[in-house]
UniProtKB/Swiss-Prot annotation:
Its cofactor is Zn(2+). InterPro entries: aa-tRNA-synth_I_CS, Anticodon_Met, Met-tRNA-synth_bsu_C, Met-tRNA_ligase_1, Met-tRNA_synth, Methionyl/Leucyl_tRNA_Synth, MetRS_core, MetRS_Zn. Homodimer. It comes from Escherichia coli O6:K15:H31 (strain 536 / UPEC). This is Methionine--tRNA ligase. One of its GO terms (molecular function) is methionine-tRNA ligase activity. Binds 1 zinc ion per subunit. One of its GO terms (cellular component) is cytosol. A motif ('KMSKS' region) lies at residues 333-337. Residues 575-677 form the tRNA-binding domain. Keywords: Aminoacyl-tRNA synthetase, ATP-binding, Cytoplasm, Ligase, Metal-binding, Nucleotide-binding, Protein biosynthesis, RNA-binding, tRNA-binding, Zinc. The gene is metG. Its main location: cytoplasm. It is an enzyme of class 6 (ligase). It is found in: Cytoplasm.
Length: 677
């Protein structure tokens, strides 16, 4: 049956750019990729995009801990994430970042439209403030007990146990993540998105029948409890986009994160030189289909805030949300101590990607059910299904075809009715892929594999091969087996991309969905090479042990400069702004009589002279060598009276001390008096 080609935009939830991809993440990306690959096989135009979610407090905090800028950290993390997804053959058309110019422009556009349409409200709120650090505490700077389900150790914006959202002030017994202090209340003006104005629209969207039943039921609970205005602003310090005309106020990460879907697609369109498609996919009356694959922990944001934001800013809403559950390993939550918190990169050091893709696919359905990765069952299932049923079907027939018939298949099918049984299954299997009933699709395919192997067992080509005058029968039987293998691999192509490549090389033909209607008759195949190797529990044991070792390494004491000289307590931007750093020319440098540590420096600030005592003598035994150098000094440090005179500032140097002191110098071109910003 010929299908009308559709235009489809598919996204996965944006991985947060402060940690590595693990097997929990991979469930979603594999699920989406299998669905996308099936859609492409059916001739649809699919754009599959993702990006790193690169803003927010956790990223800012982790970058501080690492002693690098947030920009540097998210850049390195993006490369790591893309390498992992490529390793699992996730076929993204584009992978971008929310920290991009496209995302900034779209975030500001959506905000301005919401504001123009009256959906942004300003009001002063009482906000938690850290009295020890002298700073307002954004959501992720606060932890406490969830006000809804009473789960402890939850962040200040949403509960990771029950999924509820709330303000940090609603937490029970809140504590500052930064200092551990009990926060106090301070007033601050914030911006709110008027979500209740969209209640009627959202309820109609819920009743449309498109959403999964479990999602629709959960949304109904939220409607019954009443929708609240949503705080979309955060106070500095915050890593993100500053709100236009609101100095010191930033878009909350959950405002610009879903806009990252649009930003990544805009980036893709720009790369293609296609200025039309973005509007075709995102305009209000778009006929393109838009699907978000997400985990059940972020349904609230995607089912309420996101469609309301789009509606209020005159963009189209998603066609549907495809929500999945969590991953457990061996029946329990992934555990670092047990070695079952497994990173994607660690997996690929021990197993191929197709094995996990197959196992997850075999267990997935359209429901929001958790998936258990039982490692022993994983080994048994991959060996039983991929190796014994599918690959073995090719290997047990290919030898005879290659050796006895120079790789040429028979000109007629030995059992046309059996072949028709296989091709007739395309409708049921295709519908299962389409509706995300992946487990059902795999069961149907494996049932066919059993039929194919039973046919070969009954025909016993190894016996026929020894009988005189039965060459034609042998060729027909083995050709039938190879044709059935071709159909099976075509059905499995969305799941097993690397095995498919090897199968296509052997079969000497591309596997296409419609192509199976015509069997390979009189066709020459290539010499058979091993398509897939068996796996065993020793590999699992090595994988688990490697994961444990990674945890130990991550928990090991910091070595190097940070171990001896850890990063100081966090300061606010206002604190830092008080320090006036200037470029200074060293006009003179000399020993200080009576001191074996100090040098007396005469500094020129471009019109003003300063006398500074600096404890760098051990590193610079010849002070004359410093004369004429430019350095950096703290110019507004209060003068300090010393035994040898008054020191009118401080020069900047790095290093642990002793002979390992390194005076800082600006790049060529900096002039005395220039401010360091």
């Amino acid at each position: 049956m010929t299908q009308v080609a559709k235009k489809i935009l598919v996204t996965c939830a944006l991985p947060y750019a402060n940690g590595s991809i693990h097997l929990g993440h991979m469930l979603e990306h594999i699920q989406a990729d299998v669905w996308v690959r099936y859609q492409r096989m059916r001739g649809h135009e699919v754009n599959f995009i993702c990006a790193d979610d690169a803003h927010g407090t956790p990223i800012m905090l982790k970058a501080q801990q690492l002693g690098i800028t947030p920009e540097q950290m998210i850049g390195e993390m993006s490369q790591e994430h893309q390498t992992d997804f490529a390793g699992f053959n996730i076929s993204y058309d584009n992978y971008h970042s929310t920290h991009s110019e496209e995302n900034r422009q779209l975030s500001e556009l959506i905000y301005s439209r919401l504001k123009e349409n009256g959906f942004i409200k300003n009001r002063t709120i009482s906000q938690l403030y850290d009295p020890e650090k002298g700073m307002f505490l954004p959501d992720r700077f606060v932890k406490g007990t969830c006000p809804k389900c009473k789960s402890p150790d939850q962040y200040g914006d949403n509960c990771e146990v029950c999924g509820a959202t709330y303000s940090p002030t609603e937490l029970i017994e809140p504590k500052s993540v930064v200092s551990g202090a009990t926060p106090v209340m301070r007033d601050s003006e914030h911006f709110f998105f008027d979500l209740p104005s969209f209640s009627e629209m959202l309820q109609a969207w819920t009743r449309s029948g498109a959403l999964q039943e479990q999602v629709a039921n959960k949304m109904q609970e939220w409607f019954e409890s009443g929708l609240q205005q949503w705080d979309i602003s955060r106070d500095a310090p915050y890593f993100g986009f500053e709100i236009p005309n609101a100095p010191g106020k930033y878009f909350y990460v959950w405002l610009d994160a879903p806009i990252g879907y649009m930003g990544s697609f805009k980036n893709l369109c720009d790369k293609r030189g296609d200025s039309v498609s973005f509007d075709k996919y995102w305009k209000k009356d778009s006929t393109a289909e838009l699907y978000h694959f997400i985990g059940k922990d972020i349904v609230y944001f995607h089912s309420l805030f996101w469609p309301a934001m789009l509606e209020g800013s005159n963009f189209r809403k998603p066609t549907n949300l495809f929500v999945h559950g969590y991953v457990t390993v061996n029946g329990a939550k992934m555990s670092k101590s047990r070695g079952t918190f497994i990173k994607a990169s660690t997996w690929l050091n021990h197993f191929d990607a197709d094995s996990l893709r197959y196992y997850y696919t075999a267990k997935l359905s359209s429901r929001i059910d958790d998936i258990d990765l039982n490692l022993e069952d994983f080994v048994q299932r991959v060996n039983a299904d991929i190796v014994n049923k599918v690959v073995n079907l090719a290997s047990r027939n290919a030898g005879f075809i290659n050796k006895r018939f120079d790789g040429v298949l028979a000109s007629e099918l030995a059992d046309p009715q059996l072949y028709k049984t296989f091709t007739d299954a395309a409708e049921v299997i295709g519908e299962a892929w389409e509706s995300r009933e992946f487990g059902k699709a795999v069961r149907e395919i494996m049932a066919l594999a059993d039929l194919a192997n039973r046919y070969v067992d009954e025909q016993a080509p190894w016996v026929v091969a020894k009988q005189e005058g039965r060459d034609a029968d042998l060729q027909a039987i083995c050709s039938m087996g190879i044709n059935l293998f071709r159909v099976l691999m075509t059905y499995l192509k969305p799941v097993l991309p690397k095995l498919t490549e090897r199968a296509e090389a052997f079969l000497n033909t591309e596997l296409t969905w419609d192509g199976i209607q015509q069997p390979l008759l009189g066709h020459k195949v290539n010499p058979f090479k091993a398509l897939y190797n068996r796996i065993d529990m020793k590999q699992v044991e090595a994988l688990v042990e490697a994961s444990k070792e990674e945890v130990k390494a991550a928990a090991a004491p910091v070595t190097g400069p940070l171990a001896d000289d850890p990063i100081q307590e966090t300061i606010t931007f206002d604190d830092f702004a008080k320090v006036d750093l200037r470029v200074a020319l060293i006009e003179n440098a000399e020993f200080v009589e009576g001191s074996d540590k100090l040098l007396r420096l005469t500094l020129d600030l471009g019109g003003e002279k300063r006398n500074v005592f600096s404890g760098i003598r051990s590193a610079y035994p010849d002070p004359q060598a410093l004369i004429g150098r430019h350095t950096i000094m703290v110019a507004n440090l209060a003068p300090r009276k010393m035994r040898f005179g008054i020191s009118e500032g401080m020069v900047m140097a790095a290093g642990p001390g002793g002979k390992d002191i390194f005076l800082l110098s600006p790049d060529a071109g900096a002039k005395p008096g220039h401010q360091v910003k």
